[in-house]
Amino acid sequence: MINDTIADMLTRIRNANLAKHQIVQVCSTKMTRNIIKVLQEEGFIYKFEEIGEDNNKYLLISLKYKGKRKKPVITSLKRISKPGLRVYANYKELPKVLGGIGIAIISTSKGVMSDYHARHYGLGGEILCYIW
């Protein structure tokens, strides 16, 4: 059983990027699905689809590469708020990842969104991860 599905998802994506895989399979939860939707909206992945039965669902994520050498669009992923140490910030304290090149994924009262959208709506929340 996986205790931290978000960290597991980020690790699977990181490993698939390093191995230059086109598709990666991750466990489907409401939170991982919402994070993947944000990644798709921000252009870090092509698409995703949910497969499996009710109690055993998975997400198939199509990763994005650029150039002839298939350089990954996602350079790095970092988990920030962990089950043992939650990290929260209001909208004024939300970090800019690499000066705005990357994104922070925030869990707010209005759902999971990027740091840009959270700042725009004036929402703070739990900082789940950084992606650049």
UniProtKB/Swiss-Prot annotation:
Main location (coarse class): plastid
Cellular component terms (Gene Ontology): chloroplast; ribonucleoprotein complex; ribosome
Listed name of the protein: Small ribosomal subunit protein uS8c
HAMAP family noted in UniProt: Ribosomal_uS8_B (MF_01302_B)
PROSITE patterns the record matches: RIBOSOMAL_S8 (PS00053)
Cellular compartment(s): Plastid, Chloroplast
A Gene Ontology biological process term: translation
Role of this protein: One of the primary rRNA binding proteins, it binds directly to 16S rRNA central domain where it helps coordinate assembly of the platform of the 30S subunit.
Gene Ontology molecular function: any one: rRNA binding
Family matches, as SUPFAM superfamilies: Ribosomal protein S8
Keywords per UniProt: Chloroplast, Plastid, Ribonucleoprotein, Ribosomal protein, RNA-binding, rRNA-binding
